[in-house]
Amino acid sequence: MAAGVLPQNEQPYSTLVNNSECVANMKGNLERPTPKYTKVGERLRHVIPGHMACSMACGGRACKYENPARWSEQEQAIKGVYSSWVTDNILAMARPSSELLEKYHIIDQFLSHGIKTIINLQRPGEHASCGNPLEQESGFTYLPEAFMEAGIYFYNFGWKDYGVASLTTILDMVKVMTFALQEGKVAIHCHAGLGRTGVLIACYLVFATRMTADQAIIFVRAKRPNSIQTRGQLLCVREFTQFLTPLRNIFSCCDPKAHAVTLPQYLIRQRHLLHGYEARLLKHVPKIIHLVCKLLLDLAENRPVMMKDVSEGPGLSAEIEKTMSEMVTMQLDKELLRHDSDVSNPPNPTAVAADFDNRGMIFSNEQQFDPLWKRRNVECLQPLTHLKRRLSYSDSDLKRAENLLEQGETPQTVPAQILVGHKPRQQKLISHCYIPQSPEPDLHKEALVRSTLSFWSQSKFGGLEGLKDNGSPIFHGRIIPKEAQQSGAFSADVSGSHSPGEPVSPSFANVHKDPNPAHQQVSHCQCKTHGVGSPGSVRQNSRTPRSPLDCGSSPKAQFLVEHETQDSKDLSEAASHSALQSELSAEARRILAAKALANLNESVEKEELKRKVEMWQKELNSRDGAWERICGERDPFILCSLMWSWVEQLKEPVITKEDVDMLVDRRADAAEALFLLEKGQHQTILCVLHCIVNLQTIPVDVEEAFLAHAIKAFTKVNFDSENGPTVYNTLKKIFKHTLEEKRKMTKDGPKPGL
């Protein structure tokens, strides 16, 4: 995008990189992002004729953005073009020209870097007075065919200079980027590669990593200075973030909460987010219904669960963590230097904490959750041994904090106002781990370190402390079968003994020993769940950091020994139970899956089941990676309770009273009745019925219980209510006929897919 008249405080990238003071300011300034132009400058850019703007802003035919001589080698990630790698796979660049393509062999450079897609955000004929003349055939400074003939995909999204696109258009562009990144690296350009390009990349980061808008803007600007220029563009990224929030909501009764929706409304939201094959497959079926039914059949047939390996490679998450950590480190260094130079007049610790709170306000004022780099498990800073290090900290952060801890200068009982950057009304009651404290701690250093490092430790949900994060919600990596999961285990305590797919629950053993009730508060969502808990106890993955709920007031060494001992015990119990469950026959597994669908759980651990379902509800609401991790859940009762709880939390029942009245009035034939409903209703119900059919022969009483429970969930009508018998008899006849017909179709042939 054209930069127009030089933005206020704009400096060339080479100057920013070579000037250490500017680097410190760029990385250390964590204040809310501001526009690069004044209000007057923005207004002028919209009213000055294009040829005059080009002449005044970037030099007309001698356009600086299209002249490689104006940029250092560091500013040319692709030689010959003003360009920067924003991530390892996304290149922001100024527009190339046919002359530059030939002179600098840019297409060959693209291929050598693995760039498979170029996205052009310009309109044909734009900036005709800048740089090299436009190609008459395309209206751009190059011919798109030059890239396409080399096997590089070309996309053009016309976007007005200095302007913004509609939110749905940006979402479509982001989904195209998501698809393109599966093929290889992506290059994006407008005119200068700053404004529109920066907005699109920031929106992609928000979409892919659930960063807040301001975090994404700061990250993009750290990689490509002066990006995202106008007030409208800043607002666009922020509004896009808000636009995505309700679309991502699966369970309206769980954090982050949203208004309840009907089935048709949910399917519309789902279509906004899905793309490609998945969008076509799930056009009329909620993803959670389809996935649970598929997982049930996999469990019943003891098929290996295919899921992505989240532990392979750091990917985008680590790159973002590193960049943001560097920015916080620079801020910490700056404040420590300021403190050392003013020893004679130490500032008030509360003022220091407030200063950091203000600087870091952008990381909590838009959303209260960010699963990418924050330490959800511990709100306080635990002893930083080699077992406790996180990618969220740079080595300098860790060393500095550990030195302070070893000197006894950082007690573990700092008030919540210092620990987190949330405002008081946003803060949640949390549990703390305690270690021996020095008699006279340096409160200023304590506040300084804690306030800076708390950038990483802001929790989004009080009840998510026990969930295993496994890094980023971005899942790069190969598809691998989870051997530990395919062992036929249906119990919660063996659900993925060695799998990253299981949400890990905190142990409450030490909570009951704590006389202080303030250390026992755990947040729960209020979604309705079904059935009773599966047998077994909650296990903790040995690679998962412990929740603060696990910690007593023990010294560091004792804490680590207990940590390792408990992990070994959990693994041993899980292994023995897994061997027992693997002995179930195929018929027994199918019956167990059918009982789960019918909500016939004979276990007595109802609260345990409810708690695990609530954890999955929060997980699905808070991060996209939960769809991958839930494939590791091996308890059919948890899966079915999760599915039915979603059905029952809809604003209106799947089958409304009007639908039932219509079926009764028309005396519809059972074979045709479902087709009288809307397609979303029909396909959703059929998906569940297909699942029970594919479980093959099941006991009559289990099937009857399934039909009764399905009718109750789909209609929200109890059998003993006023119209209950009519509703049940009408739908039971239709459902039974559908099951019989489907069984006839599959009796002598292969089982149809869901």
From Swiss-Prot:
Domain called Tyrosine-protein phosphatase: residue spans: 82-253
Cross-referenced Pfam families: DSPc
The keyword Phosphoprotein appears for this protein: yes
Gene Ontology annotations of biological process type: cilium assembly
Disulfide partners: none
Gene Ontology CC terms: cytoplasm; cytosol; nucleoplasm
Coiled coil as UniProt keyword: no
Enzyme Commission number(s) from the entry: 3.1.3.-
Active site per UniProt: 190
Stretch list, region Disordered: 487-554
SMART domains the UniProt entry points to: DSPc, PTPc_motif
Ranges of biased composition (kind: Polar residues): 487-498
Positions bearing Phosphoserine: 392, 394, 547
Domain of life, source organism: Eukaryota
Alphabetical UniProt keywords: Cilium biogenesis/degradation, Hydrolase, Phosphoprotein, Protein phosphatase
GO molecular function terms attached to this record: protein tyrosine phosphatase activity
Role: May play roles in cilia formation and/or maintenance.
Family listed: Belongs to the protein-tyrosine phosphatase family. Non-receptor class PTPDC1 subfamily.
Protein name: Protein tyrosine phosphatase domain-containing protein 1
Designated gene of the protein: PTPDC1
